[in-house]
Regions:
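Histidine-/acidic-rich catalytic cores in large beta-rich domains
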Residues: 1-104
């Protein structure tokens, strides 16, 4: 998986040959637009978690989710869309069975 940043896409390549197997462009995922494609994680269930960074501009006004999870068919199954509380996301880490610490 190659996130292609400002090209607003990601590419799947064959690691042995370098051949491009698939390219997903900015408007290929129904219901969302890819912006600066940051890190992409493949989850245990095969879904992809895409960091959809919205740029260098402090006051960017784009209205797209910061994280997008898509299934094997390229359909959105979950997204995080909370710029007020979370802000820009360029990378993520998926932790299996993560539990929040007791913050009280």
């Amino acid at each position: 998986l190659l996130p292609c940043g400002d090209n607003h896409c990601y590419i799947v390549i064959d690691r042995k040959t370098g051949e491009e197997l698939k390219r997903v462009n900015a408007l290929d995922i129904e219901g969302v637009a890819l912006l600066f494609v940051g890190q992409i994680l493949q989850l245990k269930n095969g879904n992809l978690l895409i960091c959809n960074w919205y740029g260098h501009t402090k006051d960017a006004t784009v209205d797209e989710p910061q994280l997008i999870e898509i299934d094997k068919n390229g359909k959105v199954v979950w997204s995080l869309h909370d710029k007020k509380n979370v802000g820009k996301i360029s990378a993520a880490c998926y932790i299996d069975n993560f539990r929040l610490p007791n913050l009280k």
